[in-house]
Amino acid sequence: MNARDYFDWVRDASRDAESIRQQLMALESRAKALGGGGFEPRTRSTPDPRRMEGRIVAYMQREGELKTRQEADYAIIGRACRLLYGEDEDGRGGVSAGCGTLHADVLWWRYLDDSPWKQVASVLGSSVTTCRAAHDAALRWIDESGTLFDAAEMYASYIKSR
C-alpha cells in the first residue's frame, strides 16, 4: 500500500466516523422520543410495552454496531495522526519532523478533515500550488521512508470487520 492509497483509506474512515456520529445522534433522538433514552422520568405511557421493547432492543443493537465501526475508524485516524505528527502527536515526529509541519498539516486538512484544496490553502495561509507541492512531497517521503509497513495488515483487518 502506498501513501496515497493509505490516505484515501484514512479519508474514507474519517467520512465514515462523521457519518456514524450523525447517525448516533439521530438514533439517540429517536430513542428519547420512544421513551427509551436518557434517565428522565417518563411523562407518557407507551401503548404496547412489547412493541416498545423490540424497538429499544433494535436501537441498542444498531448503536452497538455503529460504535464498533466508529472505534475502528478512530483507530485508523489515530494511526494517521501519529504518522503525521509522531507517537505523541506533538509534531516532533512523523511527517512533521521528516518534511515539515506544513507537509503534515496539508495531509491532515486534506484527508482527515476532508477539505478541498482552496480551504486547505486558506487555513494554512498558503497557496493551493504550495499546498499541492507539500502534499506530493509528503506522500513521496512516506513512501520512501517505509513508514507504512503495517498499513496493509491494518487495512485487511478493517475490511474483514465490515
Set out the residue ranges of the language-model regions.
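Helix-turn-helix DNA-binding motif, specifically the short coil turn and the N-cap/start of the second
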Residues: 127
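Short alpha-helical "recognition helix" segments of helix-turn-helix
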Residues: 119-124
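DNA major-groove recognition helices of helix-turn-helix
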Residues: 131-145, 149
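Short amphipathic alpha helix immediately N-terminal
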Residues: 97-115
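Short, well-structured alpha-helical interface segments that form or flank functional binding sites
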Residues: 15, 115, 130-133
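N-terminal interaction/assembly modules
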Residues: 1-96, 144-162
